[in-house]
UniProtKB/Swiss-Prot annotation:
Its main location: nucleus. GO terms for cellular component: nucleus. Residues 1-16, 114-123, 193-210 have a biased composition (Basic and acidic residues). This is Transcription factor elt-6. One of its GO terms (molecular function) is DNA-binding transcription factor activity, RNA polymerase II-specific. Expressed in the head. One of its GO terms (biological process) is positive regulation of transcription by RNA polymerase II. Transcription factor. Binds to the sequence 5'-TGATAA-3' in regulatory elements of target genes, such as lin-39. Involved in embryonic development and in vulval development in larvae, acting redundantly, at least in part, with egl-18. Perhaps acting together with egl-18, may form a positive feedback loop to initiate and maintain lin-39 gene expression to ensure proper vulval precursor cell (VPC) fate specification. Together with egl-18, acts as a downstream target of the Wnt/beta-catenin asymmetry pathway, required to adopt or maintain the seam cell fate. A zinc finger (GATA-type) spans 265-289. Disruption phenotype: RNAi-mediated knockdown at day 5 of adulthood (earlier RNAi treatment causes worms to become sick) causes extended longevity and also increases expression of elt-3 in the trunk hypodermis; longevity effect is suppressed in an elt-3 mutant background. RNAi-mediated knockdown at the L1 stage has little effect on the average number of seam cells per side, but the number is reduced in an egl-18 mutant background. RNAi-mediated knockdown at the embryonic or L3 stages reduces expression of lin-39; expression is reduced further in an egl-18 mutant background. It comes from the Eukaryota. It is found in: Nucleus.
Length: 367
């Protein structure tokens, strides 16, 4: 009897559940058949939610990929530089293990070492790891690119020059050698540049030396000076003085004519002028032609050419007004001039000046 009583409520419960399920199915069917807009709305919402979930999954995947790539790049940089303490840890490592921050900053120069780093160093027996040895042996780019063999030991010189004075002395010696080589090279270039003008000057000096050999000797110049001093002292000059002065005047005229024949006006073909000028084309013209063209903007006519130089009349001054023109003043001026041993041309020019002074004095004395 008891078993039959227990089976009866179980059957009743199962029947009630089945009836409830059937009622719900009927309700859903009636609602679906009654409202199609709600069904379409639910469908669109499901599609949008699925799209959003897929996009969120893609973003998460990309973030994980970027984080992993960044960690790889940091590890590569740390392996190349050989110092794991220069770069901060990644955010994932700091979140996962906070103790790693203390480990990474344990061996920093600017901070006090932690107990963990000190204990780890003591456990290793104070010996460096093979990774640190390798990083120490790696040469810097400066030492690798340096042409000097001893420059590889200068890694610590930049920070502390007194720690390795031998390397510092080697560097100073190398710098001095480079400076000496540069100075020698510069000196050689200057000598090569100076050789060309020196050769030109030597060739120019040879020509006047030949002309000097043809000039009168120093003894002849001394005799001329003696005769001049006798003339100023009041003694009558010997006939040799007149001959020498005439010869000197003739030779000076020949020299002036030879020198002036080189210069010639391109407009009027004159060879005597107070100053030489250049026209617009760069040709050589006399002073008169140049001034005429500047004033009238036309070339000077040929019929206006003059073979002599026109001089303005100047007021003649007496000897009292101008004592510098007296014989004593002229003689003292001649004695104060430079020596006559440089060449015969200087003596000839002095003779011409003396003749001109004598002529001017005679003209003043004449009524």
């Amino acid at each position: 009897m008891t078993s039959s009583k227990e089976e009866m409520p179980d059957e009743m419960v199962s029947r009630e559940v089945e009836e409830e399920m059937e009622d719900r199915v009927e309700e859903t069917a009636t609602t679906a058949a009654a409202c199609t807009g709600c069904a379409q709305l639910h469908k669109d919402i499901r599609q949008d939610v699925s799209k959003m979930m897929s996009k969120i999954d893609e973003v998460c995947g990309r973030l994980e990929a970027l984080i992993s790539e960044k960690e790889k790049v940091l590890l590569e940089q740390m392996s190349e530089s050989g110092s794991e303490e220069k770069y901060p840890p990644s955010p994932t490592e700091s979140r996962a293990s906070p103790s790693s921050v203390g480990k990474s900053n344990g061996g920093c120069r600017k901070r006090k070492p932690t107990k963990e780093s000190v204990n780890r160093h003591l456990e290793n027996g104070g010996s460096d790891s093979p990774f640190e040895k390798i990083t120490r042996n790696i040469s810097t780019p400066v030492s690798a690119s340096s042409p000097f063999p001893d420059f590889q030991n200068f890694n610590g010189f930049v920070f502390d020059p007194m720690a390795n004075p031998q390397n510092m002395m080697n560097l100073l010696n190398l710098v001095q050698q480079q400076q000496h080589q540069a100075a020698a090279h510069h000196h050689a270039q200057q000598q090569a540049r100076e050789q060309k003008p020196v050769k030109a000057e030597e060739s120019k000096q040879q020509e006047p030396s030949e002309n000097r050999n043809q000039s009168p000797s120093a003894s002849v110049e001394q005799t001329l000076l003696d005769q001049l001093s006798m003339q100023f002292n009041g003694k009558s000059p010997s006939p040799t003085v007149h001959a020498s002065t005439a010869a000197a005047a003739g030779s000076s005229e020949d020299d002036t004519s030879a020198n002036s024949s080189i210069s010639k006006c391109s407009n009027c073909s004159t060879i005597k002028t107070t100053a030489w000028r250049r026209d617009l084309e760069g040709k050589l013209v006399c002073n008169a032609c140049g001034l005429y063209y500047r004033l009238h903007r036309t070339h000077r006519p040929v019929h206006m050419r003059k073979d002599f130089i026109q001089q303005r009349f100047r007021r003649r001054m007496r000897e009292d007004e101008n004592p510098a023109t007296s014989q004593a003043a002229v003689f003292s001026q001649l004695l104060g001039l430079p020596s006559m041993a440089n060449g015969g041309a200087n003596a000839l020019t002095f003779l011409e000046q003396i003749n001109q002074l004598n002529q001017s004095q005679e003209q003043r004395k004449s009524p």
